[in-house]
Amino acid sequence: MANFDLTRINCQFLDRHLTFPLLEFLCGKEIYNQQELLEYILETVNKTNMIDYTMDTRKRLNLSQEMPDELVQRKAEVLATLKQLQNEVAPIMKATDILKNGESMKDSKTFVNALQKDYNFKVEHLESAYKLAKYLYECGNYQESTSYLYFCLIVMSPNDKNYLNVLWGKLAAEILTLNWNTALEDLTRLRDYIDSANFSTIQALQQRTWLIHWSVLVFFNHPKGRDLIIEMFLYKPLYLNAIQTMCPHIMRYLATAVVINRTRRNALKDLIKVIQQESYTYRDPITEFLECLYVNFDFEGARLKLHECQTVILNDFFIVACLNEFVEDARLMIFETFCRIHQCITISMLADKLNMKPNEAECWIVNLIRNARLNAKIDSKLGHVVMGTQPLSPYQQLVEKIDSLSMRSEHLAGLIERKSKQNNKESIDSWKYY
Amino acid sequence: MSRFFANGSDSESESSEEEVQAPNFNKASAFQFSDDEEEVKRVVRSTKEKRYENLTSIIKTIRNHKKIKDIPNTLSSFEDLTRAYTKALPVISKEENGITPRFYIRCLAELEDFINEIWEDREGRRNLSKNNTKSLGTLRQKVRKYIKDFEEDLSRFREAPDQESEAEDEEAHVSDAGEAADDSYAGFKKEASVTAPKIAKSAPAKSVPADDEDSDDSIDWDSDSESETESSEDENQYQNMRERFLKRSTEKGEDKGDDDKRKDKRKEQKLKIRKRAEDDEDGEWETVVKGHVVEKPKMFEKDAEIDIPLVLAKLVEIMSARGKKRTDRRLQIDLLFELRDISDQHNLGVPVSVKIHFNIISAIFDYNQKISEPMKMEHWALLLEVMQSMMKLLLANADISISESVAEEHEEYITAPFYIRGCPLAAVERLDDEFTKLLKECDPHSNDYVSRLKDEMNVVKTIELVLQYFEQCGNPNERCRIYLRKIEHLYYKFDPEVLKKKRGEVPATTATSVDVMDKLCKFIYAKDDTDRIRTRAILAHIYHHAMHDNWFQARDLVLMSHLQDNIDAADPATRILYNRMMANLGLCAFRQENVKDAHHCLVDLMVTGKPKELLAQGLLPQRQHERSAEQEKIEKQRQMPFHMHINLELLECVYLVSAMLLEIPYIAAHEFDARRRMISKTFYQQLRSSERQSLVGPPESMREHVVAAAKAMRCGNWQACANFIVNKKMNTKVWDLFYESDRVREMLVKFIKEESLRTYLFTYSNVYTSISIPSLAQMYELPVPKVHSIISKMIINEELMASLDDPSETVVMHRSEPSRLQALAMQFVDKVTNLVDVNEKVFDMKQGNFFQRGNMGNRGDRGYNRNQNNQGGNWGGQRRDNRNQRNRNQRGHHKNQQQQQQQQVQTIDEE
């Protein structure tokens, strides 16, 4: 399944620290050579300050149990730097702790003022706080890093050169500490900042591409994310354009999100348009599934693709949690489309198309009928499902049209009435002048 | 679609006015002309003398007018002259055996030269008064028309020794006069024996008056010879003098002696002039040329030490004559070549050589004074050669930098970093333009064109050299310009390697033209700061992609560049390129099975009915002076050379076929829909014109084939349809023009099958309750899943009221035909809906402006209308006016509505 694996591409757009979960996930999947993967992880880890993680990886690679001197030395160095940075920031943090309890915490401006007035706060302090946060992050201490970053965000003005970095750092740290709620907040803040800041076109595109990749992590883990991902990727032209030009592979996640979101069925049409447009740059079983089902009405193809989808999802870190939902919803989609087209279906064929056993399928359909989601009857003697839908009679059509007509006229009349009332008042007013 | 005619020649309007008027003048004069002819019937004795006298006097006035450049008067005198000549015509034919008298021809020749000179001199022409300009145009046309009758005489005159050569206007006037006089003298000697008796006979009658007048003029011959008109008078004098010599040479001995004296002086001047080797010179001239060869070394003093400053000084001296009216341009070129040889002989170094090369190039460009006309072939060859050798020199010597930014005084020829002023970029651009002009000049179907086209290689090579040079040392801007030149030679050429590479037949590392194009264009996208170069590069890039079937890349480029939005603001050449690009994109979409997109791309071009004009592949036949000659000239300059043309028949066929594939199923689906819109107007026109024919024969032309196919498709007969579209005739006419024609044909048949199936289902679904899918598949020779998919799509889109019955594999139709009453009711509802739509629209529209604060929206309900009328009385004057007016409108509106509704009810009743 390596040919549908997107980890390699996704990692290009993620922070070094964000890639570790992905890589670790892959280790458990046996798609790639375990040894090579671990070596790659080691190499990546070496670029950070996470000494313990490095050691752990070395152990897994069966390298010497002893810590090499070089590493020992580095560890000492790291600790020393950390100490130094902490010392620099300590007074200001103490002050913050004190102020936190007071009134001045409510508003960032008053807070800054209070800091400056009472504790001799300077810009250099902010600088060192930022450095410390960065250093902590690099050491893998995300929790503490967030608190410093939070401080920075409050104190910093949006014009500061580090402001964007702080935003990014905060988002990364929140993601890594699995704080999805705050991560979502930070995500929106970062997005607003990117949209409003004056980047050159190419920079903005780059920033958005990164944001898109990071946000996928958040969206699939936050309960509200499934609506938001559609909202952001599909209905914000700037982001849709970014996906189309820079990273069409994001279509996979967008498609998954649409499939598992039953309430947003109308997004499907737009999605399919985009998929068709980009079909030459990116295709994978998930987009192909939708294409088969809604463009070509090739149910056999859809069935096969659905089968492939399962393995793809199983091996994708981002969406692995949605596997069952996806399969269930995809089946429903196939069935719905089927029902719209057919008036009589044999259960055995249906079972075949849905990748189910006939008994299971019958049971499934019975459940659907029982839940009143389907107007149909089962002819068990012949093994058929007969749809109960009747086409619109001309009479009904007529009534429907007239219905809308009367609605519209009423609305119009209402408007007019309001206007005339207003006018009456006006004319009465004008009377007074005579 | 007047994409590029919109602002084509606004600036030319003034001159075009003048052109329009010209024919009227001609008509008038022609009328008078014939009138006079009738009068001439009476012949009187001694007419000849009278007539000739008349003629000479008019000629004299013309001369005087010319002298002060009084063009309107010249024009009227010229008209007098022609009239007088017509009068004299019978006499001439009788007395002179129909030979036109020389002085008359001479006058005509002079006049022509005079006009040409003024005409050429654009600067001067612009400064002329409006009246003068107008007359000049008229005069020029008249003279041109008139002298056609005398062409033979004129050419003989120009050849003959007493001529004042065509280049008269370029010559130093004094020497010119001398030459002419000399010529007439020499010519006299030669000719004397032949013509003597004849002239002798006629001379006495005429020479006396002419003599008197002319000798008066000739008194101040030497001092007053500044203007060339004067000098030509002198020539005339000598002609007369020759006649005098014939009769009484001894009497005029004094005159002759005078002549001889001057001759010595003139000889020197003459030698200089003779140097240019006229093609049409006779043997007598050649000896003079030889004389010049002897003189050549005169360029430098015999024992002068030839070094760089000297050569440069000479160069400056030669070039300073550039652009002057009487400079002999050919002489200049020759001199420059000579200078180059000299500098090469003396090893003066590469920089000097480059400089001279550069000057040769500009001299060659200068040779041709008319911008619209191409240069001569031999010059062209010379130019290419010089250009290439110069570029080679430049490339071989990296320490020379040549650019426009170097000021004259900072040029450096002696020590190492050399600086030369000049711009090879401009030169190569001009060279390229000249090449296009050359191509456009010759007939595209002749071998001439092919042989000319072979030079394309050389041009590309030259551009390549310049490009190399600028890649070494050139700022991004210049590189963009030269890249664009290369792109413009590249983009329309098909490279089969690209397709092979796509199929993996050649290794992926081979550099194809698409790769080259990519590289060049990307550089321009990144570096260019003038919008025009980028736009053109994008257009060419898309064109190239489309040509090689890179449909998606081409489409994305179009969409991302947002060209459609602002192409209307571009210059005509760019708009033409845009149209060409669109045409090609349409063809590409068609090849890539995107019929709808193909139609979209082509519809703008085809709907106007003049794709030929829009693609600049020929002018439409002119209707009633739609454009003036000036405008036509401009449009001609824009035309594409033939080898870059897009086949129009192919284009139209692709358009019509894609329109057919879209339109026919649509017609079938919406047969009874009141709101049906046509997709393609052009296609409808074709259909209608075929329906108008009382008898439709078997199709002959491409259009007839498509129409016949469309008719077959309407009854779902795919076989017939496919046969009409794909057959031997259509193959040779259209489809074989595609690179992979077989694939295209297969695709076409596939589409025809599918669309025919859809049409069939739309058209005949009401006669079936159910249709078996396998039998449909058999009928249309399509695989069952495909049929299934097509029908499913139709059901989902609610085009077909049916559903599938899986166990029996049939389509069950649900479409219950509405009863008559129901149908009418539906129609009625549709119309009422329209009414409500209109109401809403009116409401929305009025809401925005004046009526916002008033009670205005009462159109919906008649009751309010009445109320309002009552209120109306209470309102102030101005307001009341408004109100009443509005009420009237409203009432009118309501009346309309009522009428409409009544009508509708009536129609329903009738039905």
UniProtKB/Swiss-Prot annotation, chain A:
Main subcellular location of this protein, as a coarse class: cytoplasm
CDD domains, per the entry: eIF3E
Gene Ontology biological-process entries: formation of cytoplasmic translation initiation complex
A UniProt-annotated Pfam family: eIF3_N
Gene Ontology cellular-component terms listed: eukaryotic 43S preinitiation complex; eukaryotic 48S preinitiation complex; eukaryotic translation initiation factor 3 complex, eIF3e; intracellular membrane-bounded organelle
Record domain PCI: where: 219-392
SMART domains tied to this protein: eIF3_N, PINT
Localization annotation: Cytoplasm
Gene Ontology molecular function: any one: translation initiation factor activity
Signal peptide per UniProt: none
SUPFAM superfamilies, sorted: Winged helix' DNA-binding domain
Keyword Ribosomal protein recorded: no
Main function: Component of the eukaryotic translation initiation factor 3 (eIF-3) complex, which is involved in protein synthesis of a specialized repertoire of mRNAs and, together with other initiation factors, stimulates binding of mRNA and methionyl-tRNAi to the 40S ribosome. The eIF-3 complex specifically targets and initiates translation of a subset of mRNAs involved in cell proliferation.
The protein's name: Eukaryotic translation initiation factor 3 subunit E
Gene: eIF3-S6
UniProtKB/Swiss-Prot annotation, chain B:
Compositionally skewed regions (Basic residues) per UniProt: 885-896
A molecular function GO annotation: translation initiation factor activity
Keyword Protein biosynthesis: yes
Compositionally biased residues, Acidic residues: 11-20, 162-171, 210-236
Subcellular location: Cytoplasm
This protein's GO CC annotations: eukaryotic 43S preinitiation complex; eukaryotic 48S preinitiation complex; eukaryotic translation initiation factor 3 complex
Biased composition annotated in UniProt, kind: Low complexity: 196-208, 897-911
InterPro entries according to UniProt: EIF3C, EIF3C_N_dom, PCI_dom, WH_DNA-bd_sf
Basic and acidic residues bias: start-end ranges: 241-271
PCI domain sequence ranges: 642-818
UniProtKB keywords: Cytoplasm, Initiation factor, Phosphoprotein, Protein biosynthesis
Record PROSITE patterns: PCI
UniProt-listed Gene3D superfamilies: 1.25.40.570
PTM-bearing positions, type Phosphoserine: 34, 165, 175, 184
Region named Disordered: 1-38, 155-181, 196-284, 851-911
Biological role: Component of the eukaryotic translation initiation factor 3 (eIF-3) complex, which is involved in protein synthesis of a specialized repertoire of mRNAs and, together with other initiation factors, stimulates binding of mRNA and methionyl-tRNAi to the 40S ribosome. The eIF-3 complex specifically targets and initiates translation of a subset of mRNAs involved in cell proliferation.
Family the UniProt entry places it in: Belongs to the eIF-3 subunit C family.
Protein name per Swiss-Prot or TrEMBL: Eukaryotic translation initiation factor 3 subunit C
Native source species: Drosophila persimilis
Lineage: Eukaryota, Metazoa, Ecdysozoa, Arthropoda, Hexapoda
